[in-house]
Design a protein with these regions (language model features):
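Specific aromatic-rich, kink-prone transmembrane helix
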Residues: 150-169, 175-183, 325-328
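Transmembrane-helix signature of polytopic, membrane-embedded enzymes
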Residues: 110-136, 152-153, 169-170
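Membrane-interface alpha helices of multi-pass inner-membrane proteins
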Residues: 172-191, 197-202, 300-308
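Perimembrane helix-loop-helix junctions
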Residues: 5-8, 14, 196-223, 280-286, ...
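Hydrophobic/aromatic-rich transmembrane helices and adjacent perimembrane loops
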Residues: 153-154, 195-196, 310-340
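Short acidic/glycine- and proline-prone juxtamembrane loop motifs at membrane-interface regions
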Residues: 141-151, 314-315
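Extracytoplasmic
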Residues: 72, 192-193, 235-238, 348-513
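Extracytoplasmic catalytic/substrate-binding loops of multi-pass membrane glycan-assembly enzymes
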Residues: 40-54, 65-83, 364-368
Length: 514
């Protein structure tokens, strides 16, 4: 029997299974515990590895946005600092502790949602929450700890709360405020995510009309967290505003999907299929009989807009779209009085498909590639390594995992695309020209302060038209002089240089905490 059939059919009976299934939150938490236990010794993706590394450098005294160049706002990195500290105190893998922390906030999300879904009879609610646990914890398997997973986890109870408001159900101020704080922290991770509470609020306004009230515990919590976060950036990390925002405006625009076709990968197509299935039940969702399903469908539409506005096409950007749409479909079956047979069959495939894609992504990762593993083979934990690549995922699929010391202030040279395009422009922007010189100079200084045992360079193969990074850096005399101390170790899709004649590390002008 499929998950769709289980949710859509009201089980009966008084046996042990029925009694157990009648405890919805227990069923969901056991499901979550099993997933977390299976995941706890796994790896994290390159972005999360970079996040965790930064947390350690912050504790060591590095200044974010000066000693480390990062384009994202600081909240995500601040979230990782206590995880890094606790992992160091307990002497455990930081990745494992992060996975446990994500499991904990997922449990809070499920518990809050359970309190807001009491209109669904217990067995159906248990099945719905168990499926939600799978979506929140297992579907983003390879991307555990990503901002998209966190915002999905915090959106679920917030959407359920907005649904309760639309139905004028009583919710305690403490519960509403707590959900609002959690949701605010999720929405604050990216400015794009703010579109989601805005669209949910418009949906609530359309449903309540004159009965709508803007001032509620959860909206006050959203505003309070937002103001506090903005103030924290201004006073604690002003360099984000003065240094990083201008860098983003100057060079980040060309760092994205080469064309619109790249936005329609397998994960995006699954998300759109889920939205299509929901649209077939538009009349039901537009009514009052399935409030949580309706709210989650609205959130899914909002996250679809977020995905396309970002215009990157990266699979993990679809996590909240797929997650909200999947839970909306499951809620439609759980809350609905009558479920058409075709929907049960269709839902069976759509419930499973995102998990199949996630499993395929985990079993066949693009990185670390065999060439990359060969490039770092023989390096010992604590030895320094450096990369010259525009793809930030390359260094951060091995650096944290191998416990290497990272030599650069840049997680990758993504800005080179804008710099090289500018060089070929008939009217080059002098700011981008100056940025290119600064990056080469900064890199030479970083490598002089932390002499890498190996420098790994992405270079085009014969016949490829992609940009060759190394000659650009060799224009800088200091960098060229430094590279003269290295010999070529291997040439594959990556060119690896091994330190051949050691040189004394620079003693001045070096960054802190790295």
């Amino acid at each position: 029997m499929s998950a769709a059939t289980l949710i859509a059919t009201k089980p009966t009976g008084t046996g042990p299974f029925a009694k157990f299934a009648a405890r919805p939150l227990v069923v969901a938490l056991i499901t979550l515990a099993l997933i977390t236990a299976a995941r706890v010794n796994g790896r994290v993706d390159s972005d999360v590895a970079w996040q965790l590394w930064i947390a350690g450098r912050i504790h060591a005294g590095a200044n974010l946005y000066t000693d480390i160049v990062e384009t994202n706002p600081p909240l995500w990195f601040w979230m990782a600092v206590p995880v890094e500290r606790l992992a160091a105190l307990l002497d455990v893998r930081i990745e494992s502790l992060l996975i446990l922390a994500v499991g904990f906030i997922t449990a809070l999300s499920l518990a809050a949602t359970d309190r807001l879904a009491l209109h669904i009879e217990p067995i159906r609610r248990g099945l719905l929450l168990a499926y939600a646990a799978i979506v929140l914890a297992a579907m983003p398997w390879m991307h555990v700890g990503q901002r998209e997973q966190i915002v999905l986890i915090t959106t679920l109870p917030y959407a359920a709360l907005v649904a309760s408001r639309r139905e004028e159900r009583s919710v305690s101020a403490l519960t509403a405020a707590s959900i609002g704080v959690g949701a605010a922290l999720g929405f604050a991770l990216k400015q794009y995510f703010l579109l989601v509470p805005a669209i949910l609020e418009l949906w609530l306004l359309a449903g309540q009309r004159r009965g709508w009230r803007a001032i509620r515990p959860e909206t006050l919590a959203l505003v309070a967290v937002g103001i506090s976060y903005a103030a924290a950036i201004a006073f604690i990390e002003p360099d984000f505003i003065t240094r990083i925002v201008p860098l983003i405006r100057l060079a980040y625009g060309v760092f994205g999907a080469p064309g619109i076709q790249y936005l329609f990968g397998p994960f995006a197509i699954v998300g759109l299929l889920l939205l299509g299935a929901l649209s077939l039940r538009f009349r039901v969702l537009a009514g009052r009989s399935t409030p949580i399903a309706s709210a989650m469908a609205v959130a899914a539409v909002a996250f679809a807009l977020v995905y396309f506005i970002q215009f990157k096409g990266w699979p993990y950007h679809t996590i909240p779209l797929i997650g909200c749409a999947s839970i909306a479909l499951a809620s439609l079956l759980a809350e609905g009085k009558e479920t058409p047979p075709w929907l049960r069959v269709f839902a069976h495939a759509l419930f499973i498909l995102p998990l199949v894609l996630s499993a395929e992504e985990e079993l066949n990762p693009a990185l670390p590639s065999p060439d990359l593993l060969n490039a770092v083979s023989g390096l010992r934990a604590g030895e320094s390594v450096a990369f010259l690549t525009t793809e930030t995922a390359i260094p951060w699929s091995v650096t944290l995992q191998g416990h290497y010391r990272y030599a650069s202030r840049y997680n990758g040279f993504w800005m080179m695309r804008a710099i090289i395009r500018n060089e070929h422009s008939p009217n080059p922007d002098p700011r981008l020209t100056a940025l290119g010189r600064q990056i080469a100079s900064d890199t030479a200084r970083d490598f002089a302060c932390i002499p890498p045992q190996r420098i790994i360079v992405t270079r085009p193969r014969p016949g490829e038209s992609t940009f060759d990074t190394l000659p650009f850096f060799l224009r800088d005399r200091s960098f060229a002089s430094l590279l003269s101390h290295y010999r070529v170790r291997s040439r594959t899709s990556l060119e690896t240089y091994e330190l051949a004649s050691p040189f004394p590390a620079a003693s001045s002008g070096c960054r802190k905490g790295v």
